[in-house]
């Protein structure tokens, strides 16, 4: 120990050393549970010593209400999007239904008073908008994110590679007609803060200069008051109860409505898909090896049939089915522009009480069963599951399902495009037909500000025009 230290400093250093000796790798604080090392202002996060990630937020487009040919075009483009990822890039799709700050949301749609005699009308119109808001999204904000990560020896090596991948992904989103933006470090921290504080109204106060002035870590600004993983199937995060589950994909045929049905649940939840592309050569070799093993088993069964004196063409049905499926999969990988992905599908359900949590989990399980799949609790892995739901592209759950490109793409992350603008001159134009969310827009800010009201006789065309005139006047 340096000789120039006073007695108090020596005691502090000894205390730190003693705590380090007692460290058994188990997190002792909420901050230690959060599995990343450092967040940089430009949005790059160092998760481990050699793993770096970035996050892109993307908007929705109209898919569920589109014509069949448009759906097919979007699906094919999404398949091409997934095929962009090679085995060196791990990526994660995050779909977050989080409670909104009701006060600030209502403030954004309220019509401000003016010094004239129409303030009672403004108050009544604002009250109507508030009622429409209440029957729409149930106080939830639904957002979508893509987080990708690579292995690199240093930040200097990781940064140009991440920026190159980011530019390619933004171009791929543009081809889909999707608006996408890269998140900086503060925005990523704000997102994680929103996840950890789903049950309270804690505001996110953070500035990079606070780190120098206070000596705190970025985790101190986002961590909840406590994590409690006391049971094997649930946990408590601050004042909210949660449960992590994984989707066991057992259906022979998947529907593109499956992910949308999960996201349509009117409760605070997070759906996460961790996707890792498998090297094409390795995937083909593995399948060929499997086919060889199946053929060997088939020959053994045929020999057994000959010895027993019955028809050698009679083999176990499972063996015939597996052989047919394996050869079909090999054909897809070799000649149909398919890749192999390892997918982990996680669902975080929450509730303000344990009973509300169980009700939400039951609803999610019913959705999975409707699509011939099973939603199973992550027994004794709740903490690992929760941390895998963070937008860090780090999967701590070893349960994976192999899927081809088209099977992975069936989880189409698009439902319907929302149109909600903040600003002093935004007007109310009704509710979204699919999501029931408010349509608030300033037409002057759109590419084409013109409008045309269409409808059958008596459907309310003149009422819509008068409502817009009134809204603009107020």
What would you call each of these model-derived segments?
Residues 61, 68, 76-83, 170, ...:
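Glycine-rich phosphate-binding loop of nucleotide-binding enzymes
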């Amino acid at each position: 120990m340096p000789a120039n230290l006073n007695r108090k400093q020596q005691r502090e250093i000894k205390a730190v050393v003693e705590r380090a000796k007692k460290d058994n790798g188990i997190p002792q604080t909420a901050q230690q549970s959060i599995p990343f090392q450092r967040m940089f202002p430009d949005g790059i996060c160092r998760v481990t010593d050699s793993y770096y990630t970035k996050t892109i937020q993307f908007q929705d487009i109209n898919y569920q209400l589109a014509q069949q040919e448009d759906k097919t075009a979007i699906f094919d483009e999404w398949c091409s999007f997934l095929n962009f990822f090679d085995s060196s890039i791990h990526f994660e799709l995050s779909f977050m239904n989080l409670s909104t700050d009701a006060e600030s949301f209502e403030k954004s749609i309220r019509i401000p008073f003016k010094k004239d005699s129409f303030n009672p009308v403004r108050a009544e119109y604002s009250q109507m908008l508030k009622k429409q808001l209440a029957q729409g999204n149930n106080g939830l904000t639904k957002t979508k994110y893509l987080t990708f990560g690579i292995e690199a020896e240093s930040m200097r090596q990781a940064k140009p590679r991440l920026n190159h991948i980011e530019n390619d992904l933004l171009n791929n989103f543009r081809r889909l007609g999707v608006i996408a933006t890269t998140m900086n470090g503060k925005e990523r921290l704000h997102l994680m803060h929103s996840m950890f504080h789903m049950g309270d109204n804690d505001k996110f106060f953070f500035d990079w200069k606070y780190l120098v002035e206070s000596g705190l870590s970025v985790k101190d600004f986002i961590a909840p008051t406590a994590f409690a993983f006391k049971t094997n199937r649930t946990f408590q995060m601050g004042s909210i109860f949660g449960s992590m589950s994984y989707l066991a994909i057992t259906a022979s045929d998947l529907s593109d409505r499956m992910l949308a049905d999960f996201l349509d649940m009117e409760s605070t939840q997070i759906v996460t898909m961790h996707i890792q592309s498998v090297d094409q050569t390795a995937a083909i070799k593995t399948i060929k090896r499997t086919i060889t093993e199946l053929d060997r088993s088939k020959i053994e069964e045929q020999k057994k049939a000959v010895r027993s004196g019955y028809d050698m063409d009679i083999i176990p049905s499972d063996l015939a089915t597996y052989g047919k499926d394996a050869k079909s999969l090999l054909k897809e990988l070799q000649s149909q522009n398919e890749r192999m992905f390892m997918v982990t599908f996680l669902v975080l359900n929450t509730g303000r009480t344990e009973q509300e949590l169980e009700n939400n989990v039951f609803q999610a399980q019913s959705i999975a069963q409707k699509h011939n799949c099973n939603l199973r609790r992550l027994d004794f892995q709740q903490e690992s599951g929760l941390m895998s739901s963070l937008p860090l592209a780090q999967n701590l759950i070893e349960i994976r399902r192999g899927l081809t490109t088209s099977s992975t793409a069936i989880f189409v992350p698009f439902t319907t495009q929302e149109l909600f603008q903040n600003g002093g001159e935004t007007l109310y134009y009704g509710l979204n037909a699919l999501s029931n969310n408010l349509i608030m827009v300033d037409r002057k800010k759109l590419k084409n500000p013109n409008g045309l009201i269409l409808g059958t006789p008596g459907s309310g065309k003149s009422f819509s025009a008068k409502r817009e005139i009134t809204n603009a006047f107020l």
